[in-house]
Curated annotation (Swiss-Prot):
NCBIfam families on file: HDIG (TIGR00277), RNase_Y (TIGR03319)
Transmembrane intervals: 3-23
Single GO molecular function: RNA endonuclease activity
The entry's keywords: Cell membrane, Endonuclease, Hydrolase, Membrane, Nuclease, RNA-binding, Transmembrane, Transmembrane helix
Residue ranges of every copy of the HD domain listed in the record: 335-428
Transmembrane helix recorded as keyword: yes
EC number: 3.1.-.-
Gene label: rny
GO cellular component, one term: plasma membrane
Protein name: Ribonuclease Y
Organism: Staphylococcus haemolyticus (strain JCSC1435)
Length: 519
């Protein structure tokens, strides 16, 4: 039983192995068939894709080939067109050259004909010239025989006669040309000046020698006078200006020929009236303050003038000196306004003539700068102006314009001449100046200068319209006895050197002050 089971089991195993072998072989065969089928499919698909890629590449190559062919054909067409155009131009040039060649041939023929004719004429002229020379020699011999002069003598006599006639004609012609040129120059100058003057619109007010200070009421007049007149005397002594207190309601008149001192007095008095405290100590403070205010006004006036004329890079001290001209008059004409007017005129004239407008304006503005301090420094305003310009390193053209505008020296530039012309235009304008006021001021300045020429004199003020000269002396140098002697010496010199109507009162003021401060 056991053996039979074993045999059955062994037989079953063998049968299982055989069956498994055949099953596995069948499965393997099926897989191989599937693999071959898959490989065939992949190969077919690859061939299809390769065919497609090949077709696409062929199409792209055909398209590129077509584009290249079209571009090549286009370039060939353009080159053919350019060659055709060049050929046409060459043909045109060839035709032009042929025409020019024909013209040159014709001209050569004409020239040859003309040369032939000229040779014939030259032969005829030579023959006639020979005949004329023979006749001239015969005539000269006949003339020498008749006149008794040789040919050389006759020629010299004829030349002398012709020279005399030409000299007269030349003299007449030169005179006519000079007259014509002068008329043209005069006409042009008149047109130039007329145009320049019409372009300038300047306003001027005649300066006077008085200023008026309005008061809040007439009671203020008594306070200004002060106890026993000490306030008014202090103000007059410190400023050198006359205070006229009369029946004019609510007003005090300040009289003085020096506009700067008069402005200082006016400013101080206005401040005193506004402040209400009027006594000698306060008056001194206000006068000092007024001097500083007027200095600021002077500086502002100078800066405003340079700004108006558009002049730059001027030394600040020279600008301040220029501003002092606002308080200076010449024959009643404000000198600063006159200088501005001259600057404008000089600039316009320079522009018309093509000169440096800026330099001409600068020279015109500074031409009278010496008048700002001519009553303080010896010398004419021209000399003082030249020294100021040199001191503050002004341009040589400006210095010459200042020096030559009154004819003291010869002008060295066109600008100097233009400044002198502009100065004359401004001064000669109707109503610009008044002779009487200028003479009056010069007389008062001369009176002050004469009095200040003595040792120990600190300041001198001409007041009462020149009827009194008030001399302030140093108490350390002048005692009471010398004060009387000084007054007498000044009186004698005034009588000897000045001409004046009526009498002039000489007052010598000697004041000693002792000041201490309690701490």
């Amino acid at each position: 039983m056991n053996l039979l089971n074993l045999l059955l089991i062994l037989l079953g195993i063998i049968l299982g192995v055989v069956v498994g072998y055949f099953v596995a072989r069948n499965l393997l065969h099926q897989k191989q068939l599937q693999a071959r089928q898959t490989a065939d499919d992949i190969i077919k698909q690859g061939q299809k894709e390769a065919d497609n890629i090949k077709k696409e590449k062929l199409l792209e190559a055909k398209e590129e080939n077509q584009i290249i062919r079209e571009q090549t054909e286009s370039e060939l067409r353009e080159r053919r067109g350019e060659l055709q155009r060049q050929e046409a131009r060459l043909l045109q040039k060839e035709e032009n050259l042929d025409r020019k060649s024909d013209l040159l041939d014709k001209k050569d023929e004409i020239l040859e004909q003309k040369e032939s004719k000229l040779e014939e004429r030259q032969q005829q002229v030579d023959a006639k010239e020979s005949s004329v020379q023979t006749l001239i020699m015969k005539h000269e011999q006949e003339l020498e025989r008749i006149s008794g002069l040789t040919q050389e003598e006759a020629v010299n006599e004829q030349l002398q006669r012709v020279e005399e006639e030409l000299s007269q004609d030349i003299a007449v012609l030169v005179k006519e040309k000079e007259k014509e040129a002068k008329e043209k120059v005069d006409k042009k100058a008149k047109e130039l000046l007329a145009t320049t003057v019409q372009r300038l619109a300047a306003d001027h007010t005649t300066e006077s020698t008085v200023s008026v200070v309005n008061l809040p009421n007439d009671e203020m007049k008594g306070r200004i006078i002060g106890r026993e007149g000490r306030n008014i005397r202090t103000l007059e002594t410190l400023t050198g200006i006359d205070l006229i207190i009369d029946d004019t309601p609510e007003a005090v008149i300040l009289s003085g020929f020096d506009p700067i001192r008069r402005e200082i007095a006016r400013t101080a008095l206005v401040n005193l009236v506004s402040d209400g405290r009027i006594h000698p100590g306060r008056i001194e403070e206000m006068v000092d303050k007024a001097r500083k205010e007027v200095d600021d006004i002077i500086r502002d006036a100078g800066e405003q003038a340079t700004f108006e004329i558009n002049v730059h890079n001027m030394h600040p001290d020279l600008v301040k000196v220029l501003g002092r001209l606002n308080y200076r008059t010449s024959y009643g004409q404000n000198v600063l306004k006159h200088s501005i007017e001259v600057a404008h005129l000089s600039g316009m004239l320079a522009a018309e003539l093509g000169e440096d407008v800026s330099l001409a304006k600068r020279a015109g503005l500074l031409h009278d700068v010496g008048k700002a301090i001519d009553h303080e420094v010896e010398g004419s305003h021209v000399e003082i102006g030249v020294e100021l310009a040199k001191k503050y390193a002004e341009n040589e053209t400006v210095i010459n314009a200042i020096h030559s505008h009154h004819g003291d020296v010869e002008p060295t530039s066109i600008i100097s001449i233009l400044v002198a012309a502009a100065d004359a235009l401004s001064a000669a304008r109707p109503g610009a100046r008044k002779e009487t006021l200028e003479n009056y001021i010069r007389r008062l300045e001369r009176l002050e200068t004469l009095s200040e020429g003595y040792d120990g004199v600190e300041k001198a003020f001409a007041i009462q319209a020149g009827r009194e000269i008030r001399v302030i002396v140093s108490p350390d140098e002048i005692d009471d006895l010398k004060s009387y002697r000084l007054a007498r010496d000044i009186k004698t010199q005034i009588e000897d050197e000045l001409q004046y109507p009526g009498h002039i009162k000489v007052t010598v003021v000697r004041e000693t002050r002792a000041v201490e401060y309690a701490k």
